[in-house]
Design a protein with these regions (language model features):
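Iron-sulfur cluster-binding electron-transfer modules in prokaryotic oxidoreductases
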Residues: 1-212
């Protein structure tokens, strides 16, 4: 208790490589912005796996844990870590599944994606960034199909495409989009959704990635 932000992120960010780098990055952003934040051991999974199997009741149970954790901790806002399934469920279903979230500060959007939050800090010049530190890398961005086709960001059409790219461009000098017919709404499945992430389906996942 006592934190302003509850960060809810995919569980892989706590134990898997390279996902843990995401959690480290979130912590750096919060620290530099001077934000009091916390995570919950009760609601420690942002990815709502019930969407894999189409169970609305289980989706509700998982989302309810996040609602309850935010209320018990007395935070002002909830911020979601990067995860296509997590963001789709939060953006499209939270309010009707377990809302209202009227105990949160109405001054902040709910839910809020970590990219939205970081982009806002960058635009307000609250983060010190050194783009040249990443000059050895050439970066691109894969649009999550769940985010691209079923959500938005920033309260505007196309925000789910513009905001993540704006964050990347703010921290590097060498960003290049992939072919137009493979990005935005035309994105390919990354092989992480719908249960395809399981080891048993590795061969199928690789076949799906080959058109890239």
């Amino acid at each position: 208790q006592g934190a302003d932000v509850l960060l809810v992120t995919p569980s892989a960010d706590f134990f898997a490589e390279p996902h843990v780098d995401c959690l480290i990055g979130y912590a750096k952003v919060f620290h530099q912005a001077g934000i009091k934040w916390t995570v919950s051991s009760y609601a420690s999974e942002a990815a709502n796996f019930a969407m894999f199997i189409g169970s609305q009741e289980q989706m509700r149970e998982v989302a309810q844990r996040i609602w309850q954790a935010a209320r018990d901790l007395g935070v002002k806002r909830i911020i979601l870590g990067e995860c296509g399934h997590a963001w789709r469920v939060a953006y499209s279903f939270w309010d009707t599944l377990v809302g209202p979230f009227d105990f949160l500060d109405p001054a902040y959007p709910m839910p809020m994606h970590i990219c939205e939050y970081t982009d806002d800090l960058i635009n307000r010049e609250k983060l010190r960034l050194n783009k040249a530190a990443n000059d050895e890398m050439t970066l691109t961005f894969h649009d999550s199909c769940n985010v691209a086709r079923a959500t938005s960001m920033g309260g505007r059409p196309g925000g789910q495409f513009e905001i993540p790219r704006a964050v990347i461009k703010a921290v590097c000098n060498n960003f290049h989009d992939m072919a137009d017919d493979t990005i935005h709404e035309a994105t390919f499945c990354c092989g992480g959704g719908g249960g395809l992430l399981t080891d048993d389906l590795t061969e199928l996942r690789v076949k799906g990635a080959k058109p890239r």
